[in-house]
């Protein structure tokens, strides 16, 4: 059912449009909150698999795939883990990160082929990301993974979708209709990013990559991170700033 503001958006002022978008965005956090039990179950299962030596794969198309890649790419510098621990895969390959590869998401076989390149095994976990829950690339791959005994989860904004039905641990976030009809890069994308933050952050905490709330395993690869490492050392072992600088050669 159309909302009161759905008509004639093009006639509204900039102030009105951004106020309406912001109003809709406020519902996203509450929608995520309603699914915390499902998110908890998924994270605990991923943690168990990682402690067996498993990896985490995010699989998606379009915006969903890009969000998975974004979250995965932040894990090595933030938590000091191998770039092969959390891996984002997008339909159409790396070229789809910058330029849409619209028909890539329709393949029923490419997703499994993409995972096989990483020698996927039963210790790994795969999360399918699809706002609609109908993307063939994702649905078919998650179904295949489950049949192989691989832990499967999904993030979708469409209840009782085909994706939810074929995965082991579905997380369904109902965010209400998008501000622009069908533009799932908006609230659906925001909800997805929030949950990916929860998944990667909580998993890294539970496998020992965080002390208190500090990134104790971050990789010192630039001046900003060097200075951050100095501050972490100061906080955790009460070094003076000067004493911490003396350890630079060992960082």
Predicted regions mapped to residue ranges:
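Glycine-centered, small-residue-biased loops immediately flanking beta-strands
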Residues: 54
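A short, well-structured juxtamembrane/interface segment
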Residues: 34-48
């Amino acid at each position: 059912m159309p909302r009161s503001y759905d008509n004639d958006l093009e006639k509204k002022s900039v102030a009105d449009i951004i106020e309406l978008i912001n109003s809709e965005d406020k519902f996203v956090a509450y929608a995520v909150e309603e699914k915390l039990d499902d998110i908890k179950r998924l994270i605990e299962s991923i943690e168990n698999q990682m402690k067996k030596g498993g990896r985490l794969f995010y699989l998606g198309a379009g915006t969903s795939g890009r969000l998975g890649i974004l979250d995965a790419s932040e894990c090595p510098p933030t938590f000091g883990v191998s770039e092969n621990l959390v891996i984002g895969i997008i339909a159409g390959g790396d070229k789809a990160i910058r330029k849409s590869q619209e028909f890539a998401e329709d393949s029923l076989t490419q997703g499994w082929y993409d995972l096989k390149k990483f020698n996927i095994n039963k210790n790994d976990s795969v999360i399918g990301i699809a706002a609609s829950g109908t993307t063939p690339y994702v649905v078919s791959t998650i179904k295949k993974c489950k049949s192989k005994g691989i832990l499967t989860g999904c993030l979708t904004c469409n209840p009782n979708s085909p994706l939810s039905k074929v995965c082991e641990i579905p997380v369904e976030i109902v965010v209400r209709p998008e501000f622009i009809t069908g533009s799932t890069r908006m609230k659906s994308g925001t909800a997805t990013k929030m949950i990916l933050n929860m998944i990667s952050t909580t998993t890294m905490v539970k496998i020992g990559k965080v002390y208190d709330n500090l990134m104790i395993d971050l990789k010192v690869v630039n001046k900003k991170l060097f200075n951050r490492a100095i501050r972490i050392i100061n906080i955790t072992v009460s070094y003076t700033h000067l004493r911490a600088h003396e350890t630079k050669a060992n960082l």
